[in-house]
Amino acid sequence: ADIESENLIKSIISSESTYPILAEESGKSSNDLGDVFWVIDPLDGTSNYNRDIPICCVSIGLVIEMKPILGIIYDFNNDHMYSGDKFSNISKMNDISINVSQKSDKKESILITGLPHNTDYSDSSLNNMIKDMQDWQKIRMIGSAAIAACYIASGKAERYQETGSYLWDIVCLLYTSPSPRDDEL
C-alpha cells in the first residue's frame, strides 16, 4: 500500500510542480533536493494500517530552505483533512479552524511518544524516559507521528516526542500546528 500510494502522490505532484520530492519509500538524496522540495509520507502508521488499527494517514508537505512551509495530513479512516501553512498561521480540519491547546503545565498535559525499533533499552535510557514521563498527566503511543501532529494541532494533546524520526515523519508537526510553541516540539 505504501508504494502504490507514494507513486500516485508523486505522479499528481509532478504533474503540477517541478520541485523535487523526498518520499519515504523511494527516498532521494538530500544533495539532489535543492532549496524547495516536497516531503511525502504515503502511509504514516504502516504497522497500524497492516493490522487494521485506524490510526494512519497520508502526509504531504512543502519545505523551503529546510523550513516546513505548508502541508496536509489526510486521516482517511475518519475523512479528516488537516492543513496548515506558515503564511496564514492557521490550522484547519476540513476547512474549519482548529487551535493548539493552551495548557503549559505538564501535569495537565498529554505527551504523545513512541518507541521505534532502534530504541535504546539500556537501564539508564529507560530510567531517563520514565523520569520524563512521570511529569506528564498522560502518555499516549499511537503509532503515527502525523496523526500526533493532528492531535496537537486540534488541542487533543500538547506535545509529541520521539527519537529516531525522519523528516517525513515529523515535518507535519511543524506546519499543521503553527504556534509560538513550535520550538518545543
Residue spans for each PLM region:
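N-terminal subdomain of lithium-sensitive/metallo-dependent phosphomonoesterases centered on the IMPase/IPPase/PAP
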Residues: 1-43
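DPxDG-like acidic metal-binding loop motif
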Residues: 32-87
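ATP-dependent small-molecule kinase catalytic core of the GHMP/sugar-kinase superfamily
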Residues: 76-107
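An extended, acidic
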Residues: 99-177, 181
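N-terminal low-complexity segments that are often proline-rich with Ser/Thr-Pro
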Residues: 184-185
